[in-house]
Amino acid sequence: MTSPATFGLSKSERLYLRDEINTVFGEGKAFVVYPLRVVYRLGSEHRAAYSSMLVSVAKKRFRRAVKRNRVKRLVREAYRLNKHLLNDVLQERQIYATIAFMVVSDELPDFRTVERAMQKSLIRIAGNVPSSALKNE
């Protein structure tokens, strides 16, 4: 278990650069754990944080900004509390991950549903981390 100081979500853990976002969506692998669609990319290039993430909620699904922001807040909170499930594996194997979470539900999910989906998705990504650094990236 990590120390309580690592339960924050710093700027280095947020995915915000256009080039990195395009790389994740262009070269990443995707799967769905309802209500989340997860796109991730593993690489050996050095970063400030072992995993960085972004959250996207479509305006088509939630018309009101208040609801979109609430869903994004729920996903960020679930990630913040459960990121140790993935970061421990990434740190041990010296691999870096960029992850995009997109909400595919049309209804406002509760925190318990989002947290279960987040745990399943982080465990699934951790299971796909190779045992040694990637050669071609």
Curated annotation (Swiss-Prot):
It is an enzyme of class 3 (hydrolase). SUPFAM superfamilies: Ribosomal protein S5 domain 2-like. This is Ribonuclease P protein component. GO terms for biological process: tRNA 5'-leader removal. GO terms for molecular function: 3'-tRNA processing endoribonuclease activity; ribonuclease P activity; tRNA binding. It holds the Pfam family Ribonuclease_P. It comes from Porphyromonas gingivalis (strain ATCC 33277 / DSM 20709 / CIP 103683 / JCM 12257 / NCTC 11834 / 2561). Consists of a catalytic RNA component (M1 or rnpB) and a protein subunit. Keywords: Endonuclease, Hydrolase, Nuclease, RNA-binding, tRNA processing. The lineage of its organism: Bacteria, Pseudomonadati, Bacteroidota, Bacteroidia, Bacteroidales. InterPro entries: Ribosomal_Su5_D2-typ_SF, Ribsml_uS5_D2-typ_fold_subgr, RNase_P, RNase_P_CS. Gene3D superfamilies: 3.30.230.10. Its EC number is 3.1.26.5. Signal peptide: none annotated. GO terms for cellular component: ribonuclease P complex. It catalyses: Endonucleolytic cleavage of RNA, removing 5'-extranucleotides from tRNA precursor. RNaseP catalyzes the removal of the 5'-leader sequence from pre-tRNA to produce the mature 5'-terminus. It can also cleave other RNA substrates such as 4.5S RNA. The protein component plays an auxiliary but essential role in vivo by binding to the 5'-leader sequence and broadening the substrate specificity of the ribozyme. Belongs to the RnpA family.
